[in-house]
Amino acid sequence: MGINLKDLTVIKPINLAELRGKKLGVDAYNMLYQFLSSIRQPDGMPLQNSEGIVTSHLRGLLSRASYLNSEGIKLCFVFDGVPHPLKRRLLDERKERKKKAQREWEEALIVGDLEKARMKAQQTSILTKKMIDETKEVLDTLGVPWVQAPSEGEAQAATMVKDGILDAVASQDFDTLLYGAPIMIRNLTLSGKRKLPKQQKWINIDMEKIVLEKVLDKNQITQNQLIDLAILIGTDYNRGIHGIGPKKGLKIIKECGNAEKALEKLEQQIDNLDDLRKMFLDTKIFSTENVEVAWKEPI
């Protein structure tokens, strides 16, 4: 899910040529969910093989990995590990939303509303262990390296960029910045137009490059303050303070200096503030000295 910090970022539209020769750490779960959500039939059903097994994730993976490789861009997929207990609330809420979307999908099919059916179907996507294993097998066949993180894949990828193993993290989630990724790429190869649901309106989608240092400079805050700001808004690990969005949160963090003083001014309380900070500053990762990343010839 992630947190929406777009209004606070400095976004530079880029094209594939600017990424040629670069090594990108791909937020694997993030990208696979994109494929499972978007690669569907008109009625919302995912692609399946003759045995009824979902293949949307593999279709998307083969297409995108092959295309980016042909453009001289090296990918390293980083997979999430065991979620932290603080994320349980979010995961439970997602599960309930998917159940609701499943019911609404079925209802839309009954009345013949295919546009609504497809929209609701996209919200039911589930990434199974079998799909993850299949993805890793395909990556091995393609000669594309992958890393299994102990916990958050974005945190592992961010560290690999900081340590010079990779050049940027490719993800849709602005949480990547909270984990300290120096550079992130959004909308990787998604340039084009996208139709807004239930509207006869199309929006442009461009690849975006976001540099953490420029984000901090623009807002005149530190990395620790960015994390405190996110906690006030609400993250994957906490609900945040009602009525606090990016702009209001930024203002109060700059006025108060940190989350403790901001909460005091707001007369609000977040009990596990230090634990939440540690989720971004000290997340469990593998040392890059123990991570092997090598691009090989396809099998």
Model-inferred region functions:
Residues V82-P83, E152-Q156, L177-Y179, K247, ...:
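Short amphipathic alpha-helical segments embedded in low-complexity Lys/Glu-rich regions
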Residues I165-D167:
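Glycine-enriched alpha-helix->loop->beta-strand junction motifs that scaffold or abut catalytic
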